[in-house]
Amino acid sequence: MPKKLLLHICCAPDATIPWPEFTAEGFETTGYFYGSNIHPEEEYKKRLEALNILKAFVRASVVLPGYEPSAWFSRAEQFAKEPEGGKRCEVCFRTQLEAAARYAAENGFDAVSTTLTISPHKNVALINKIGAETAKKYGVEWIERIWRKNNGFKRSVEESRRLGLYRQNYCGCIYSRRDEGEEQ
């Protein structure tokens, strides 16, 4: 019987490589799109639409815990002035991965993992550390992967284009949008 894996998905483009590969490895893989860190809401909707396209392609289901940006802001707002990659991002990773691990434990999943490590801009050691901590806290296995290895990011860009997926130009929160020069 295959292991049930809950795959935390930060965005559809970043899931184009991990989702099919986990499935090919024999995992019964379900996506988990946290999304409450994504601002504004119109951006969340664009990313959700892209995820629905990918979901149809990989023929799998996705858990949508609900869009609740106020819950995310209550944790991250105190770090609004932090640069991209700082304490705010650590809090954001922990918020998302803890929500995924909790859901996995409460819904009979054996393991949890994330697509976050495909990005060349993210601290993969920190992501995997937080993932392992939150999985242990909830009694599920953490499947550590560094998806950006072996040109993972480049392959995800190519696959996203092939599928016609929306590709965003900032991580997700309004602060990362500001840091990328989108918002003044």
What is the role of each PLM region?
Residues 1-184:
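Nucleotide-activated chemistry modules centered on ATP-dependent adenylation/adenylyltransferase
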